[in-house]
Amino acid sequence: MDTREFPLDRTRNIGIMAHIDAGKTTTTERILYYTGKIHKIGETHDGASQMDFMDQEKERGITIQSAATTAIWHGFHEQWKDTPYRVNIIDTPGHVDFTIEVERSLRVLDGAIAVLDGAAGVEPQTETVWRQATTYAVPRLVFVNKMDKMGADFQMSVDSLKERLDVNAKAIQWPIGAEDDFAGVIDLIQREAWYPDDKLGTEWEKRPIPDDLKDLVEEKRDELIEAVADVDDSLMEKYLGEEEITVDDLKAAIRRATLALKFYPVLAGSAYKDKGVQLLLDAVVDYLPSPLEVRPYTATDPDTGDEVDLKADDKKPFAALAFKIMTDPYVGRLTFLRVYTGTLKSGSYVQNTTKDTRERVGRLLQMHAITRREIDEVFSGDIAAAIGLKATSTGDSLTSVDRPLVLESMEFPDPVIQMAVEPKTKADQEKMAEALQKLSEEDPSFHAETNSETGQTLISGMGELHLDIMVDRMRREFNVDVNVGTPQVAYREAFTKTVQAQGKYIRQSGGKGQYGDVWIEFSPNDEGKGFEFDNAIVGGAVPREYIPAVEQGLKEAMQSGPLAGYPLVDLKAKLYDGSYHEVDSSEAAFKIAASMSLREASKTAGAVILEPIMKVSIVSPIDNLGDVMGHVSARRGMIEDQETHGNTVTVTSKIPLAEMFGYTTTLRSATQGRGTFQMFFDHYEAVPRNVQEDIIKNAGKE
């Protein structure tokens, strides 16, 4: 048996998350450089970054797929020279169309670094990823990056954490200067000033704290101690008893408070200028949890329904979550795993409890962005990739064959935008089907379906960029050229009233007839709850073997709603009565009866069309505020908030997606190219009646 290279207490599984352009990938690059993983630093804006390994990422300078990497850290002062730490890093995208990747990564991480742009502080997408991290109870450090940038303001960035996220966050470092004068950082805990000694920031020199910063350092250190003492009893005792608080006391209290999600340490630096990244790595070791310190993951025993806590332990049976599927040009299908308990050797079998199948793991790989190292065994707390799992998809539980468990799965958002694609040539037809299947396996927020009546293929996803990139990947990775239609909004339909309806199907045409009869009560379900079927039949009015056919008949009928043919969603159906015929009843007859019942109900159930409402954040020069407010109201939008930073203003609003097509051009021309906007899905809501009539008319169902 292989022995574990790094004990669990010296392992960190972390993610790097941020708003687009806050410098996340550059920060990861520097971490890899300082931990000895790369010998040459790649810049994102040169298209040479190690973590951004897909062609589109290199061209667009944004991170799309979260790559997993392993790095080894000996400490800024080589303090862990003989006992280094292993840091597994997942680089996540900051672009809103790819929130699925962030969600997917956070589910399997133990800690995270939130990167802020020092000139902007907390931005809209920061709020989204922060909320996601809170959902999964992930402890975080905050790295205020780009301190060398025009307008960089560390105090503003720290304050924005309290103002916009309402969290207890305080600086544990202070920058020496800002913008062009950003020279180094002061460690508030140790009261030390650090200046880089060479261009790439590998050598640093400790100097006395500059005189003009001494008072500020003491003031900020006191603020730090108070903020931590507020949430940590043992530090509070020392603080109130006016006992001496040593460096070790303070560090231990910061660690406890960070792991308890009661405190978020804030650090300063500039990854691009090679300042502050090693101290950030030290903070990862000092303040983020090992797999032993996170709250145990919950799994369920499929036989008893009992909950089981999964605590990292190599001696326990194997349990892991498949959190990402990728197609690799050289080795084929890769399944990324987060191992919670136990160990797994290559060549052994695992039980996929989500799909109830057994699969053999061919090979195991440790990934470094795009290069890989073959390993014989993975241990609890590890992140690795497996080859050979053909049936496994994202969110599946993989456990030992002798001890099957089902891990809490991942939830994926429904797509909000769709467009038609068609292959350019007959030869592309088959390749397109294969490409779409592989892409939707990799990305659960990307869907592809072919309409059986029209033969048209629709792809749907989280935004225009998302779909652009998928079409691009079809061309590059699968050699499929497609023509694309204009993007369309993914509307839905829903009932607003509770109604009861009968569906009775009788057919007599010589020989065996058909008979199915059901009474179903339909009622609206909460948003996002989907379809819920309740079998309330007593006394066998509908025999048990036909119940699944009724449910299936409803599901199929819901694919095309009564108003304009959009999917019917969020519906409860209670089957409470019906009748059958000894000879003529069949599954097919009950399926048809169920769909007739739904069609009948839709006449009186107050059906409405739902549209995706986006949260839109528009940043523009303050002189154009009037234009922007006009844009929002002209697009059926509601303004929620506006904030002024210097001579720019940020307007946050909710606007229907249908009104946002082409807005980039409108905003650009109104602001001479200086305005930008970001939008992400917020919720679905009913469209106004006049809009609904237009949608129905356009769908040709009037």
UniProtKB/Swiss-Prot annotation:
UniProt main location, coarse: cytoplasm
GO biological process: ribosome disassembly
Segments forming domain tr-type G: 9-292
Positions that bind GTP: 18-25, 91-95, 145-148
Pfam hit, one: EFG_IV
GO molecular function: GTP binding; GTPase activity; translation elongation factor activity
PANTHER family noted in UniProt: RIBOSOME-RELEASING FACTOR 2, MITOCHONDRIAL, TRANSLATION ELONGATION FACTOR G-RELATED
Name this polypeptide is given: Elongation factor G
Source organism of the structure: Oenococcus oeni (strain ATCC BAA-331 / PSU-1)
Gene that specifies this protein: fusA
